[in-house]
Every structure is written in structure tokens, then in C-alpha cells.
Amino acid sequence: MQLICRTLEAAGAPPAPAASYNSPVTIASDLERARRLIFAADEEAAKQLLLSLDEQIEKADRDDLLLEVYAQLGEIYLVRTAYNGVEECLGRITDCLTIYQSIRAGTNPEAAAKSTMSDADVDHMICRYSRRAQFLRTGLAAAAHGDHEAAEAGLLVLTGDTSTAFPDLAAEHRFVVTYARILCASALCDDDLHVRSVPLWRHVLKAIETSCGDSEFDDFLLVQAGTGYGRFCVETGRLSEAEPWLQRAGARAMKHGWKLATARTQFERSTARWSAGDRAECQRLVHEAYSAIAEGYRAHDVSRCWLYFGLLSLSIEMLDDADERFGHAERHWREVEKPLHIHRILLQRSWVDIFRGDFAAAKERTNEARMLLDSWPRRSWLQSARLDDHLGSILRAEALADPDNAAAKFEQAAELKVPAALAVDSVRHSMTDADARMRWANHVSARILAGAFAVAWEWGNTELVSELIEYHSARGSFSTEPDAQAADWTETATAAVPLDTVDEYALVAAGSAVSTGAALTRLGPLPPLRMDPTKGPIMSRYRALAFERYGCAVTADEPAWSTWP
């Protein structure tokens, strides 16, 4: 007797023809086939198969099988970003479980009279599908709403369910916990919250390495984890660590013939090649991957492909082609409402405007990007500093294009670039670990500091140039930075987010200096620097702006250092 019998059309799915059989064994076999189709990312075929079982399951009077249909459909809608469908499936699972829980509590005698399941079977079903519902609830909070706190709470409920009453559900529970962690970690990375994802990735990798690895479920998790963690490594500047995971995930996906999963690993490898400066290999990989990604209806990944297509066009100065490709990326990100990514692609598209000499259009895009960033509740000071530095680059380009009226533009550019440079550099020198300092220099501070020097030099402001040199000399670190820097436009939308970051280090930067023995680099903020006994400390206004805008106190509360002979 079905206790839930609503049709699935409300979830946005068309009715499907019913199968001509209703054997529970055959239905269970079809559910397993649907699961394999989901693993292969053939969601349309899986959905049609699942929908075709609805009437037959109703005739078989098996609510447990119907719950499995809802659970699998919910997963399909989740990965396809059809979040209304996820909510519909989640609601149906919850409604059904509520009825059976009331039966077991003895508070619903009418429903109890209709139920044909034993108490043990009811308890088994409640345990199994409460977990599956919690998985959908957690994934929905992370992926659809970016509500990482709710996702974390949901994950705690899922991991805290340590019941051993049904040993046959233990493997499935491990699967949904690990899969939920992958989804939550990936969602954090989408929002530039890579630091918060680290504990999740640690749990995921441990689960992968300790699994038996002898089932399709294990292989699916390995592919999802390897792809997600590989992307995490690329985005945090750990390219050497990314490649083995992406290769391993790609090989396992290829073994099963999972075309979309294979393509996604290829695409992540292409992003690593771009970061390493290997444009030819990046182009080969992204073009090979795009077809399967587009056919898989992954709007976010499609947008990322178009971003790299645009970057490749921009690298050979095909401005119209680059702008068109960036436009495709922006359109797809707007469709899935990704404000942080829309802000990035607007900044990237503004480089096309800069190269065309259309500085008004570049500023307009940048101002729209700022509005999106300001409305983003999880924005970081580093994102704001990078945006200010970018606007300074527009003003610098405008000044270079109009030498007769350049002074005012250079001054405005310096007002943006120098405080941003001081802020990110102060964070670099708050790090006691030398490798962390070098990663921060490679991916954040070196380029921004170089831009500040360039503006001061091109402005002809010898006083500011001297002060920047004095500041850098006081750090004792002229020889510790990489020699070559990529052009500004190459990293606007793809800049790495080092784990040695963000708000925590803004606070550390304001702390006391760290003694490092005989080291040439002073850790922590510098005290005020005075180059001339008749004048005040250098760059005082720029340091004040750095604190006002980003919360980075770049000056230690100590007596001033005198740098004259």
C-alpha cells in the first residue's frame, strides 16, 4: 500500500513510459543500472529509467524502492544544478519518512493499518533514507546556496550518525559521507574559501587511501576526489601535487568509460598547464575536454572552459575572439548565479577593453565587479586588494596612452596600487615558514608590488620610487623573489589563492615582529622608516590607506628606524 504516490512531474521531469513488469527483483536491478548511469554521468538516461519505474513500484507496494528513486533523482538534480528538483525529491523523502516514523512511534494508527512492512524493515528504511536525505540536504546547502555553515552542520549530522544497527548499510554510509565531504570542499573552493576546505580534503583523501577500491562506488569516489583535490591544488599553487591526483582520477575514469569524468580531469590538467605557462599543452587539453563537458550540461565547468578559451585567444592578441569567449563564460555564470565568478570574468574582460584603449568600458566592468564583490558576504580583503590593484592598472594604462595628461592618472593609480602592495607584502612577512612566504610571493605579492614600482617609476615620482626601494631594502629581500613575472592579464580570473592566507594573516601582520636570528628578512610589520631627519616617516599615507581599506596594519608600533647614514 503506497503511503506516498505523488507524480514526479513537479520536479521538472516529463512523464516516462511505464515498464511492462513489476517484479521487485527486476526493479532493484533497474535501480542498480540507474546508479551505473549516474556514475557515467548519463543523467538523462538514468532519469528516464528511474521515472519509468514509478508506476511499477506503486503496484509492487514498495515505498523503500520509491525512496531509492527519489534519492537517486535528487543526486541527478544536484549535479545538474537543478536545485528545485533536489528540493522536491528531498521533500518527498522527508514526507514519507515522517509517516513511517509516526507509525513506529505509535501516533499514526491509520497509516499503520495500511503498512505491510515489518518493524525491522521500517527501521532499516528509516535509517537508510534519513542518511540519504541528509546527504541531499548538505549538498544543497553547499552547492545551491553557498551556505557553508549550514552545510557544515548537515555534515556533522551525517558523520555523527554512528548507528551500527544495520551493518549492511555501513558501506553506503561511508560512501555518502565521503561524497558529501567532496561536495562541501568543492563548494568552499568555489567561494575562494580554500583554507576552510583543508580538513575536509584531509578526511576525503584518508577515506580514498583506506578504501578497498574493489567496487564501482570506490572508483567513483576516487575520480570525484582526485578531480576536486587536483583542482584545489592548482588553485592554491601546488601544481606538482595536483598532477598525480588528476592523472590517477583520469586513468580510473577512462577504465570505466566515464567520458565526462575523464574530460574533467583533462580540463583541470589544462588549468595547471596554464598556471605553469605551457600555453600549447593547455590549449590541447582544454579543446579535447570541452566537447564532453558541454554535452554533460555542467554550466560551471562550461564557463571555466570558455574562460580558458578566451585567455588563449588573448595570449595571441585575438581581442574580438577573446571577448566573445569571455562573453560566453559570463553568460553561463550568470545563468547559474555565481556572483564571485561573474566578478572575476568582468575583470578579465576589462583587459580586452584596456588593450583596445576603451578605458571607460574597462572602468565600467570593474565598477560592476566591485558591486558584485561588495554584495558578496564572504568576500576577503585579498579579493578587494586585487580589485583595487586592477583598477590601478587601468588608470596606469590610461596614463600611458595620454602622456600629456598622465600625471593625475598615475597619481590615482598609485593611490590604489601602493596600499594594496603594502598590504599583501605585510602579510607575506607575517609568515614564519619560508616556503609559505615564497608561495605568497609567487602567487600574490610579487606581481602587485612590481606594479606599484612601475607606476611610481612611470609617474616620474622619484621620491616614491626611493621610498619603495628603501622599504624593500629594509625587508632585506631584494634577492629572494622570483625574477620573472607573468603579465597582469594572465592571472586576473585565475589567480591562485594560497592556503597561507587571508584574514588570519591580516591580523598577524599587525602583531609584533618575529626574531629570526641572523636572517636578513625581518618578519612582521616594519616600524616607521625615516629617510630624512627633516621629514616624517615614509609612505605614511599609503600605509594608513592599507589599514583603512584592508585591515592590514603594515606599521609596527615601535620607534622609527632611521635609514640615513
Residue ranges and their predicted role:
Residues 22-23, 41-42, 61-62, 120, ...:
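Short coil/turn linker motifs that delimit alpha-helical repeat modules in TPR/alpha-solenoid proteins
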Residues 51-58, 91-104, 156-168, 202-214, ...:
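Amphipathic alpha-helical segments of tetratricopeptide repeats
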Residues 294, 300, 311-565:
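Alpha-helical solenoid repeat scaffolds used for protein-protein interaction
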Residues 28, 66-70, 129-133, 172, ...:
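Residue register of alpha-helical TPR repeats
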Residues 33, 66, 73, 138, ...:
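Structural register within alpha-helical repeat arrays
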